[in-house]
């Protein structure tokens, strides 16, 4: 078998970035035509404000966070500014911040940005925390950073620790549903999220923020603005932190985590546009505790089991016995979960004439995961260690143009994206050994055959795994071409029909036997000799190489009518496709043939109304949005795994998500207020797993209700000091669980919960410090003020994780939410 490497990806990405730099330099060096950046006169402006010509990247990014941009959208979008992001708490990451958009809920195992979490947007998921064995709709949300896609195009997944530091963000925009063709990527089944980092400014300055608090939490964020130097504006931003978990094992292990992020962007504006270059790295890693049984079980000891499955002496492990926030002893189970992503990109925006703008962006992304797992819960386990180190590389180019005409704004363009993903993973135990009774020969890549002599003893290792292993490659190419026309026949009405042609091309190549040739040979040997041969694992890439290609057309239409200056009524309909999730220990390509149409499909429509008053009486910045949505998600492929990581099978489904989102925000003098509400119902029209039909069952982990409300006030006190008290409350309603024993949804629900948070900040003017700085802020936050005990996630066990099957299955396990925590921050702006 040919050994596959990422060498060709690296060379292509280097070429792509070189081309980006050349295009940017050429655009900057070219003589600029005498064009004004102001909108063209005449009917273009008279008909609709949507005809405004926006050229610079800074304006495009920051405009997306403005209330007026939300008001002018024909979708139920939500923009979270810096103040709303702070609702996540000073050490909360991307997942926690997004939970303050309507219809968004989060489940995870930690309180900082360094731990993984799952995000649900109107019921559809993104991110992964290693929780339930059933991943119903994961990977259905597109995620981008500064407009650059972050999601692994092969697996569809994005890990929340890739954006662990919200302190370097300007805001985030959430789009519900696929959206118009111009703004889609390759997995916008359920919507998209764009994280907008701090942007370069014309004035020099910066800030430093230092935080310390509960669970030995430490965090620092630094932002530096160079101001305009030779026409270039540049920003450097970064942050890092560490924390112990709020869960502690009986043996005292505190499950620590760490994270950091760094961002650089430089931009130069010229007469007819701008050019920018950016780079980003996000990293989060830490020890991940297991779900804990809610009630005690005689088979589940905090010290594990002996080789015969008998519980070892020690306390029974459950929330009722070892403590609500307890974790399994690290001497029997622990896992370090590491995630990192790099982005490098270039962007050009050029106004070609008074009617046409050209946009281009090129990028390269690399993603790495590393799971180092120790599992001695059952003494002498053959899979004592796991070393899971997959990686992905992506490069792409998106080019498009906006054409502004008297009654139309036309968008036309497309993108090319190439991704390589490797699923490398090894399970092994150095205590699992085999002594050969006859010789075994294997051939490593690029080497002569090697023979292991009779009598040789070989033990498991990361290089020669004795348990399951894999190293499979997916080469995925995504192509997109789109056309949309925002037609404005009268000033108050805009209708935007669109069409998008998409292509998903996949080359799959199993590479386990090439990556681990000695293990493959010993696997074959053990199959021959039989008995309790130690090398009983198998290459999880069971099927051969295959190439698939799927081409689809995605029609859409959106409409917005503004009968009054403060009222807009909107609606939209769209079809979108995506590749199903792949890359674990089985499923499509690896153990299930990828035949027929495997593309997952979404057909969604929305209808709603928005009210917007920049000023009305004593109120300002009033924005209210009411939205109904209905999403039919079909041709679903649902991988089901046991609690100890074994792939059990592939389910198929067809489901409907529908509900209502309400959001409101307003200022009343110095009082700032926001509130968000979601009511949703999601059910399977059809769900089949291993020959059993579960039609009509609820889709797991879709809260019936989510609600949040918050407010803060500016008190101007003595000598320029400003006090800002803040309060916010978050409620998550009941949600159905997944039954890992059945591999199917359950009618059982986990309880609702609500959490209250408070903060107080005092901002001292720079005059107190001789104007050496602009201002200094002192802040105290109290998260979960009432110390509410609740589980943020629950599942029904198959008995695999704690080796209780078949005697004891179907019991509930949970991940507790964080208890009360107090954080103090000192921030200096200069």
Q: Where are the regions a protein language model picked out?
A:
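Extracytoplasmic beta-strand/coil segments of soluble accessory domains associated
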Residues: 62, 74, 93-149
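Transmembrane beta-barrel wall of Gram-negative outer-membrane proteins
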Residues: 205-207, 211-242, 247-304, 309, ...
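Structural signature of Gram-negative outer-membrane beta-barrels, strongest in the C-terminal barrel
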Residues: 407-409, 415-417, 470-631, 712, ...
């Amino acid at each position: 078998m040919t050994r596959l490497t990422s060498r060709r990806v690296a060379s292509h990405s280097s070429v792509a970035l070189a081309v980006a730099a050349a295009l940017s330099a050429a655009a900057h060096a070219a003589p600029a035509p005498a064009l004004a950046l102001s909108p063209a006169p005449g009917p273009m402006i008279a008909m609709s404000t949507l005809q405004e010509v926006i050229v610079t990247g800074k304006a495009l990014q920051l405009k997306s966070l403005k209330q007026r941009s939300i008001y002018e959208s024909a979708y139920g979008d939500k923009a979270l500014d810096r103040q709303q992001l702070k609702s996540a708490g000073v050490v909360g990451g991307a997942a926690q911040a997004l939970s303050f958009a309507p219809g968004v809920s989060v489940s995870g195992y930690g309180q900082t940005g360094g731990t993984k979490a799952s995000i649900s947007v109107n019921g559809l998921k993104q991110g992964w925390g290693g929780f339930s064995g059933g991943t119903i709709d994961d990977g259905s949300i597109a995620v981008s950073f500064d407009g650059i896609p972050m999601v692994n195009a092969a697996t569809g997944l994005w890990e929340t620790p890739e954006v662990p530091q919200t302190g370097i963000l300007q805001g985030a925009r959430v789009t519900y549903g696929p959206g118009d063709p111009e703004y889609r990527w390759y997995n916008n089944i359920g919507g998209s999220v764009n994280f907008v980092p701090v942007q370069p400014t014309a004035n020099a300055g910066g800030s430093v923020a230092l935080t310390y608090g509960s669970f030995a939490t430490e965090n620092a964020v630094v932002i530096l603005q160079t101001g305009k130097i030779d026409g270039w504006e540049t920003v450097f931003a970064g942050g890092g932190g560490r924390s112990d978990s709020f869960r502690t094992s009986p043996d005292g292990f505190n499950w620590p985590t760490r994270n950091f992020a760094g961002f650089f962007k430089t931009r130069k504006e010229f007469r007819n546009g701008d050019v920018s270059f950016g780079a980003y790295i996000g990293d989060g890693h830490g020890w991940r505790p297991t779900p804990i049984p809610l009630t005690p079980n005689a088979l589940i000891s905090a010290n594990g089991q002996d080789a015969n499955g008998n519980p070892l002496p020690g306390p029974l492990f459950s929330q009722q016995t070892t403590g609500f926030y307890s974790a399994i002893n690290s001497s029997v189970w622990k896992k370090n979960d590491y995630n990192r992503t790099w982005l490098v990109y270039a962007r050009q925006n050029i106004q070609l004439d008074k009617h046409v703008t050209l946009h281009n962006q090129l990028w390269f992304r690399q993603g790495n995961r590393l799971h180092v797992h120790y599992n001695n819960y059952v003494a002498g386990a053959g899979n004592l260690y796991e070393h899971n180190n997959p990686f992905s590389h992506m490069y792409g180019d998106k080019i498009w143009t906006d054409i502004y005409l008297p009654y139309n704004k036309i968008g036309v363009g497309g993108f090319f994206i190439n991704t390589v993903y490797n699923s490398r993973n090894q399970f092994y135990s150095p205590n699992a050994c085999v002594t050969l009774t006859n010789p075994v020969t294997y051939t490593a890549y690029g080497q002569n055959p090697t023979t292991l002599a009779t009598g040789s003893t070989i033990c498991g290792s990361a290089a020669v795994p004795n348990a399951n292993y894999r190293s499979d490659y997916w080469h995925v190419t995504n192509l997109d071409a789109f056309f949309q026309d925002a037609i404005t026949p009268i000033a108050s009405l805009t209708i935007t029909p669109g069409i998008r042609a998409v292509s998903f091309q996949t080359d799959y190549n199993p590479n386990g036997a090439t990556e681990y040739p000695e293990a493959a040979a010993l696997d074959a040997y053990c199959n021959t000799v039989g008995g309790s041969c130690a090398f009983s694992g198998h290459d999880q890439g069971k099927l051969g190489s295959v190439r698939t290609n799927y081409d689809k057309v995605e029609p859409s239409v959106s409409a917005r009518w503004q009968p009054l200056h403060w009222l807009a009524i909107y609606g939209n309909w769209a079809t979108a496709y995506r590749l199903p999730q792949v890359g674990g220990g089985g499923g499509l390509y690896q153990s299930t043939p990828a035949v027929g149409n495997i593309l997952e499909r979404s057909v969604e429509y929305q209808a709603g109304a928005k009210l917007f008053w920049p000023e009305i009486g004593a109120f300002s910045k009033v924005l209210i949005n009411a939205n109904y949505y209905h999403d039919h998600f079909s041709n679903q492929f649902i991988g089901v795994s046991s609690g100890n990581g074994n792939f059990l099978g592939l389910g198929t489904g067809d489901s409907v998500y529908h509900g209502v989102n309400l959001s409101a925000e307003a200022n009343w003098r110095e009082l700032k207020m926001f509130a968000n509400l979601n009511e949703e119902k999601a059910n399977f029209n059809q769900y089949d797993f291993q020959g059993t039909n579960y039609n009509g069952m609820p889709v797991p982990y879709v809260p019936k209700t989510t609600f949040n409300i918050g407010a803060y006030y500016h008190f101007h006190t003595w000598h320029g000091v400003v006090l800002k008290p803040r309060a916010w409350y978050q409620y998550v309603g009941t949600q159905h669980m997944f039954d890992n024993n059945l591999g199917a949804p359950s009618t059982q629900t986990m309880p609702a919960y609500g959490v209250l948070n408070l903060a107080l900040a005092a901002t001292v003017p720079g005059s107190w410090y001789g104007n050496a700085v602009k201002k200094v802020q002192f802040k105290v936050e109290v998260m979960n003020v009432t110390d509410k005990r609740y589980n943020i996630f629950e599942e029904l066990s198959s008995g695999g994780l704690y080796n209780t099957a078949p005697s004891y299955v179907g019991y509930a396990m949970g991940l507790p939410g964080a208890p009360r925590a107090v954080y103090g921050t000192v921030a200096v702006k200069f």
